[in-house]
Amino acid sequence: MANQIYIISLIFLSVLLYQSTTVLSFRQPFNLAKPCKRFVFYLHNVAYDGDNTDNATSAAIVNPLGLGDFSFGKFVIMDNPVTMDQNMLSEQVARVQGFFFYHGKTKYDTWLSWSVVFNSTQHKGALNIMGENAFMEPTRDLPVVGGTGDFVMTRGIATFMTDLVEGSKYFRVKMDIKLYECYY
């Protein structure tokens, strides 16, 4: 009986090892010089200020905790329009839906989780971006960690550049998204 369990276990491990080496041997290495897809978009954020209910695209659902001068603890949800140019009234190609929160006690820093949801005839699905957003820096690189639809299991880098800030009410971010692992 013990010998039979040993043989079955050995066969199972052999099949498992064979499958894993087969999958790994067909993986294509990333070519960082040439992404398989690239998008340049503009995200437009209009913060809710108590009066602009119809125009707001983001709102704080948890206000700062008062632990410093850098909005520590503030949690913001958003549903922002995305356009191909800097004009917020241009045709929307996608929406960024998700949240970010301020987690820096000694400087302005946010951590975000966003889905770039495409609503065009050219692309269907969403890209998922998450990570540290040191938004006081001129450019920030965040990982594209997956997606749905046309972007299922994709990976890449989203470079954010703050394009315009109008006080605490409006900001625009240029997003340069390069995908290095594409399946569709």
Curated annotation (Swiss-Prot):
Classify the source by domain of life. Answer: Eukaryota
- Glycan attachment positions: N55, N119
Q: In which tissues is it expressed?
A: Expressed in root vasculature and meristems, cotyledons, flowers, siliques, and leaf trichomes. Localized in the interfascicular/vascular cambia and developing xylem.
Q: Which cysteine pairs are joined by S-S bonds?
A: C36-C182
Quick one: signal sequence residues? 1-25
Query: Which key words are in the record?
Result: Apoplast, Disulfide bond, Glycoprotein, Secreted, Signal
Spell out the GO cellular component terms annotated for this protein, sorted alphabetically and separated by semicolons.
Answer: apoplast
Against Gene3D superfamilies, the record matches this protein to: Allene oxide cyclase-like
Q: How does it assemble?
A: Homodimer.
**Family membership:** Belongs to the plant dirigent protein family.
- Biological role stated in the UniProt entry: Dirigent proteins impart stereoselectivity on the phenoxy radical-coupling reaction, yielding optically active lignans from two molecules of coniferyl alcohol in the biosynthesis of lignans, flavonolignans, and alkaloids and thus plays a central role in plant secondary metabolism.
**What is this protein's name?**
Dirigent protein 13
